[in-house]
Amino acid sequence: MTTIVSVRREGKVVVAGDGQASQGDMIAKGNVKKVRRLYNDSVLVGFAGSTADAFILFDLCERKLEMHQGNLTKAAVELAKEWRSDRALRRLEAMLIVADKTTSLIISGTGDLINADNDLLTIGSGGYFARSAATALLENTDLDAREIATKALTIAGDIDVYTNHNHTVEELNA
């Protein structure tokens, strides 16, 4: 798996992820870019799960964003509906965090759309570790969104064997 973190703070939104790809109990690659920009660089997307499946979902997400002129909520609803109802897509094993200037969501293959709680979202095998660390940092420090996401990923990477310390961090002004 992996760890993806999204943090919103002080007019910034950050989506960050580690770079480890695993095959069973073996590390296949250590520098996979699991966080990308879509729709004219206005939407950040991070994935956890199967890399091949995630690329299919990135493409589908881009098409839904274009169809809805960049309206992330509408695009996410349509993506979740199609992902859940299409026989081939239903078999995809991945989760997405998507964020733009105003909205952060988790999209899952079961059709779930989850809004950010306390300006924080995490997915992947190290998600609970990263969430705990980021929550503590949000509540007890003045660190910015980028620093919180990076520190949370580092802590998750120290604990979770499926998360490494090779981070990709993308940021938008919110």
Swiss-Prot record:
It holds the Pfam family Proteasome. Its main location: cytoplasm. GO terms for molecular function: metal ion binding; threonine-type endopeptidase activity. GO terms for biological process: proteolysis involved in protein catabolic process. Na(+) binds at G157, D160, T163. The active site is at T2. It is an enzyme of class 3 (hydrolase). It comes from the Bacteria. It is found in: Cytoplasm. Allosterically activated by HslU binding. Keywords: Allosteric enzyme, Cytoplasm, Hydrolase, Metal-binding, Protease, Sodium, Stress response, Threonine protease. Its EC number is 3.4.25.2. One of its GO terms (cellular component) is HslUV protease complex. It catalyses: ATP-dependent cleavage of peptide bonds with broad specificity. Protease subunit of a proteasome-like degradation complex believed to be a general protein degrading machinery. A double ring-shaped homohexamer of HslV is capped on each side by a ring-shaped HslU homohexamer. The assembly of the HslU/HslV complex is dependent on binding of ATP. PANTHER family: ATP-DEPENDENT PROTEASE SUBUNIT HSLV (PTHR32194:SF0), METALLOPROTEASE TLDD (PTHR32194). Belongs to the peptidase T1B family. HslV subfamily. This is ATP-dependent protease subunit HslV.
